[in-house]
Amino acid sequence: MWLYGKREKLLWAVGGTAALTVILLSCSTFETNRSILAPPSIPGAEFVGSEACETCHESITRNFRTATHARLKAPGDNAKEMGCEGCHGPGSLHVSSGGEKSKIVNPRRSPDTCFQCHLEVRARFEMPHHHPVLEGKMSCADCHNPHEGRAIKGGGTSLPQQVKGGGTLLLGQNETCFQCHVAQAGPFVFQHEALKEGCISCHSPHGSVNARMLTERNAVLCLKCHLQEQKQGGAIFIGDSDHTTRLPQGTCWSAGCHEAVHGSQVNAHFRY
């Protein structure tokens, strides 16, 4: 995390080392201990295995082999419940009908399929401020591609998270958000450094108790990076700027001081 103040170099060094460790561990991990909690059921259908899916969905099944979801274990000893049918349900009726869409589960149309395993995400969508997935206006697949890469359609400017695009970063985390949030995309003459870490450094995309799906309330969010300290003589500095007094309640932008929080074309301090 970028930190403006005395501890910047130390924290950046520690954070960089930790990030490298995570990357190395990710690259060396070929299987996961997580199991599919509840594969979907389809009345009258049986599991046929992912090989049957490959007959029609060749490119999807080929890319899926490198995806996180492909490494999930099946409940019990039924290996056929792994792979495609772990999320789409048993496919025998879908296959025998020549690909009839009503005879297979499509998580894009039913986010409850994803929520069978992602229970904590389902809970976040119940929070006061959230993306409208439960309301049916969005689906998990609008931001995530479970068939490729590590499954998050974006990984920040340089973060190796799951993305959409053949196991590579076709869309960064920010670019995924900017598909809808166009005004925040820029480019700006003066860009907020926080964007380099990705939108999720400030926002909780599944849901939050805070307005605008912010991860923290009020000025606490800004102070995670911009250190507030009292110097000799009583002056209050935030970063390198003398703010005279400690931050009031509210946020740095709602108070009318830094309204262009994502970036500005005319002011280096994001005042407007």
Which residues make up each language-model segment?
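Short sequence/structural segments immediately N-terminal
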Residues: 2-12, 22-272
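Hydrophobic alpha-helical membrane-embedded or membrane-associated segments
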Residues: 17-20
